[in-house]
Amino acid sequence: MTSSYGHVLERQPALGGRLDSPGNLDTLQAKKNFSVSHLLDLEEAGDMVAAQADENVGEAGRSLLESPGLTSGSDTPQQDNDQLNSEEKKKRKQRRNRTTFNSSQLQALERVFERTHYPDAFVREDLARRVNLTEARVQVWFQNRRAKFRRNERAMLANKNASLLKSYSGDVTAVEQPIVPRPAPRPTDYLSWGTASPYSAMATYSATCANNSPAQGINMANSIANLRLKAKEYSLQRNQVPTVN
């Protein structure tokens, strides 16, 4: 065993000398030149990437160290929370509590609003004392009431315009499509004249004339006889008057 171990130890310097020899170094360099990584320039690219990564890491570290936010580490979250709390407090202070009015207060306010939509300071103060409110609350109520009044007016005007447009459109359609009037009923006289023939009308007219002619002849004869009688009487009266010689 000792002899074999000694033989191995003796061979190690020989191997080291063989690797360090110039011929062996040239062989290793030739193998390295023909390797895949050397042919594809992967070794140089890897070295460049590694160097660039080291530079980026160094710059990032310096920027983080130089930033003012990280210098005060645990102070920034606390400051942000304080700012948020202060803003919320301001909003709560600015927000007013909603006032609820009872029926008597609303009646008094509505009566004044019916008289004037813009009461002056004296009227508002007097009204506030009567309804047990502050003058500012009364002023805000009148502002809201005026806005509501304007909204109602606009809605009523819009409804009125819509109804007018609807009626106008209905009139236009009626003019465009007129209804045919029904024929008026004809009188009975017109129907009798229309149905009777002209010959029948002439016959009736001649019959009436024939019926009236005898009466007219008798009247004329009577008048002639009367004239004759009057003439005879006149002649007789003249003959009876004595003549003076």
Swiss-Prot record:
Biological-process GO terms, alphabetical: artery morphogenesis; cartilage development; embryonic cranial skeleton morphogenesis; embryonic limb morphogenesis; inner ear morphogenesis; mesenchymal cell proliferation; middle ear morphogenesis; neuron fate determination
Broad class of where this protein is predominantly found: nucleus
Entry keywords, A to Z: Acetylation, Developmental protein, Disease variant, DNA-binding, Homeobox, Nucleus, Phosphoprotein
CC terms in the record's Gene Ontology section: chromatin; cytosol; nucleoplasm; nucleus
Protein's cellular compartments: Nucleus
Positions of post-translational N6-acetyllysine modification: K160
DNA-binding region: 94-153
Residue ranges, annotated region (Disordered): 1-22, 63-103
Record motif OAR, residues: 222-235
GO molecular function term, any single one: RNA polymerase II general transcription initiation factor activity
Xref: SMART domains: HOX (SM00389)
Signal peptide range: none
InterPro entries: HD (IPR001356), Homeobox_CS (IPR017970), Homeodomain-like_sf (IPR009057), OAR_dom (IPR003654), PRRX1/2 (IPR043378)
Bias type Polar residues, positions: 69-84
Phosphoserine modifications at: S21, S197
Oligomeric form and interacting partners: Interacts with SMAD3.
General function of this protein: Master transcription factor of stromal fibroblasts for myofibroblastic lineage progression. Orchestrates the functional drift of fibroblasts into myofibroblastic phenotype via TGF-beta signaling by remodeling a super-enhancer landscape. Through this function, plays an essential role in wound healing process. Acts as a transcriptional regulator of muscle creatine kinase (MCK) and so has a role in the establishment of diverse mesodermal muscle types. The protein binds to an A/T-rich element in the muscle creatine enhancer.
Disease involvement: Agnathia-otocephaly complex: A rare condition characterized by mandibular hypoplasia or agnathia, ventromedial auricular malposition (melotia) and/or auricular fusion (synotia), and microstomia with oroglossal hypoplasia or aglossia. Holoprosencephaly is the most commonly identified association, but skeletal, genitourinary, and cardiovascular anomalies, and situs inversus have been reported. The disorder is almost always lethal. Strongly expressed in cancer-associated fibroblasts (CAFs) in various cancer types. Its expression correlates with unfavorable clinical outcome. May be essential for the tumorigenicity and metastasis-inducing capacity of CAFs. Can reprogram tumor-suppressive normal fibroblasts into CAFs.
Family to which this protein belongs: Belongs to the paired homeobox family.
Official protein name in the record: Paired mesoderm homeobox protein 1
Record organism: Homo sapiens (Human)
